[in-house]
Amino acid sequence: MKENYVAAGFKKTVSERFPAEADALNAMFNARLEELRAQNAGASPEKLRHLEGQIMPGVAAYEALQNVMPKDEALKTIHDYVEERAWKLKGIFQKIAGFPGVYRLIPGLFVKGTRKMFGESAGFAAKEIQTGKGVWRIDMVKCPYHDACVRYGCPELCPCFCDSDDITYDELHPKLAWHRTKTLGRGDDCCDFCLKIKAK
């Protein structure tokens, strides 16, 4: 199985910058990750995808890094991991969106994808505002990223994941508009997502 990108980034950071403490930091990261897994053992497969993919490694790495660097630097380090991955994803999505006519399908794919991978079983709750005619517009009122970061005492970590959405989906295609003014992770009442085909 491919190594989680946060775990890989963490290992690289500690081996390059803190070689003397690397073994202890990796052990700390792994122990905390196992502890988080035990605490979330009852999570649904849909929610585990998010927990294992980003949330739990993010929390474990953030906590471990604070043993060798200031809190704000640890936060920036995690943000860098997330941002690097977001730019890679953006490149892939831009290539797909660049095929003739594909951009027209993307809002509809967001509708289906949100319902499948970002639904209640995954720990999300969305209010659909408009999901048709070239528009995907929802208010996400519950998010497991936000909930977990608050639960584990690091609400400041959540905006790292919020920012990744903006990096990945903004300017996917010249004829698509990405818009969001609020996020739960930044203290707002919802994440007001919108992706739509631009008016002619």
Task: Describe each region flagged by the PLM.
Residues 53, 63-153, 157:
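Amphipathic interaction/junction segments at domain boundaries or subunit interfaces
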Residues 14, 65, 118, 165-168, ...:
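Hydrophobic, Leu/Ile/Phe/Ala-enriched alpha-helical segments that form helix-helix packing faces
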Residues 36, 83-87, 96-104, 167-171, ...:
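Charge-rich, low-complexity amphipathic helices
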Residues 22, 73, 176-177:
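Secondary-structure boundary/capping signal
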Residues 1-65:
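N-terminal, charged low-complexity regulatory/assembly segments
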Residues 134-139, 144-148, 152-200:
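C-terminal non-catalytic interaction appendages of large macromolecular assemblies
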